[in-house]
C-alpha cells in the first residue's frame, strides 16, 4: 500500500470513529438519566473539545450550545434530580405528556416501515395510558428485527438496560457500530429505514412535552445530526 493510500485509509478510519462517537454520545443521553459522572465528562476539557467540534457545524451549533449551557447548571444533586424527573416523565411512564422512544410505536412493519398512527404523546455492548394495541407493539416485530441485527453482529443489549431493541438509544448505538464496520450504503439504508422515518415526529413530541427543554435540545441535535450525516453518506 502506498504512503498516500495509507494516509487516506487512516483518515477514513478516523472519520468513521468520530461519527461513531457522536452516535454513542446521543445514545447515552436517551438511554438513562444524566449522571454526575456524565456531566463531569462533558464539562471536562476533553468533553468541551468534543462539543465545540460538533458546534462548528452551523446546523448543530444552537442545540450544542444550549445543551452545554444546561450542563453547566447541573452542578447540584437537586438539579440532577430535576432533570431525572424530566427524563422519567418523558420516556419511562405512560401519560399525556410522555413521549415514546420506541420505533415500533411510530412505524408499522406490515406497511414496509412507513409511519403508522402516531402516539400523541447506551444501550448495547459486544459479545393517558397507551392502548392494548400500542402496548402490544412493545417487544414487537421491530424489536425482533433489531434483536436479530444485534445478534448477527455479535452485539447484545446491556443487562442493565431492560428496554426493547427498537428503543432510540439502541438504534443510535447500533448505527455507531455500523459506522466502523459497514459501508456508506448499508449505513444509509439502515438510517433511512429505521430512524429517519419517525425521528421528526419523535422530535416534535419531545419539543411539545419537555418543559425543562434539555431533552428538546438533545432531540433537536439528534435530528439535525442525522440530516447532516445522511448528506455526508450520500456524498461519500
UniProtKB/Swiss-Prot annotation:
Primary residence: cytoplasm
Coiled coil feature spans: none
Pfam families on file: Nitrate_red_del (PF02613)
Gene Ontology biological process terms, A to Z: protein complex oligomerization; protein folding
Keyword Cytoplasm: yes
Disulfide bonds: none
Location within or outside the cell: Cytoplasm
InterPro entries membership: Chaperone_TorD, DMSO/NO3_reduct_chaperone, HscB_C_sf, TorD-like_sf, TorD/DmsD_chaperones
Top-level lineage group: Bacteria
UniProt keyword terms in alphabetical order: Chaperone, Cytoplasm
Entry-linked Gene3D superfamilies: 1.20.120.1820, HscB, C-terminal domain
UniProt GO cellular component terms: cytoplasm
Family: Belongs to the TorD/DmsD family. TorD subfamily.
Function, in words: Involved in the biogenesis of TorA. Acts on TorA before the insertion of the molybdenum cofactor and, as a result, probably favors a conformation of the apoenzyme that is competent for acquiring the cofactor.
Protein name: Chaperone protein TorD
Organism: Colwellia psychrerythraea (strain 34H / ATCC BAA-681) (Vibrio psychroerythus)
Amino acid at each position: 500500500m502506498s504512503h498516500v493510500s495509507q494516509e487516506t485509509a487512516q483518515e477514513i478510519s478516523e472519520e468513521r470513529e468520530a461519527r461513531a462517537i457522536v452516535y454513542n454520545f446521543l445514545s447515552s443521553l436517551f438511554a438513562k438519566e444524566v449522571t454526575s459522572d456524565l456531566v463531569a465528562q462533558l464539562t471536562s476539557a476533553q468533553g468541551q473539545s468534543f462539543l465545540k467540534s460538533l458546534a462548528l457545524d452551523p446546523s448543530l451549533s444552537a442545540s450544542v450550545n444550549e445543551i452545554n449551557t444546561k450542563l453547566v447548571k447541573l452542578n447540584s444533586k437537586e438539579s440532577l434530580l430535576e432533570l431525572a424527573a424530566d427524563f422519567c416523565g418523558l420516556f419511562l411512564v405512560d401519560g399525556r405528556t410522555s413521549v415514546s422512544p420506541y420505533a415500533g410505536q411510530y412505524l408499522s412493519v406490515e406497511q414496509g416501515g412507513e409511519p403508522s398512527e402516531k402516539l400523541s404523546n447506551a444501550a448495547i455492548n459486544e459479545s393517558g395510558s397507551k392502548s392494548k394495541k400500542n402496548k402490544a407493539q412493545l417487544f414487537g416485530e421491530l424489536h425482533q428485527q433489531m434483536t436479530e441485527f444485534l445478534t448477527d453482529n455479535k452485539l447484545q443489549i446491556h443487562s442493565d438496560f431492560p428496554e426493547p431493541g427498537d428503543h432510540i438509544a439502541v438504534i443510535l448505538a447500533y448505527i455507531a457500530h455500523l459506522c466502523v464496520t459497514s459501508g456508506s450504503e448499508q449505513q444509509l439504508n439502515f438510517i433511512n429505514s429505521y430512524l429517519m422515518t419517525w425521528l421528526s415526529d419523535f422530535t416534535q413530541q419531545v419539543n411539545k412535552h419537555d418543559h425543562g427543554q434539555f431533552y428538546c435540545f438533545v432531540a433537536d441535535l439528534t435530528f439535525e445530526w442525522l440530516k447532516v450525516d445522511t448528506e455526508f453518506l450520500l456524498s461519500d
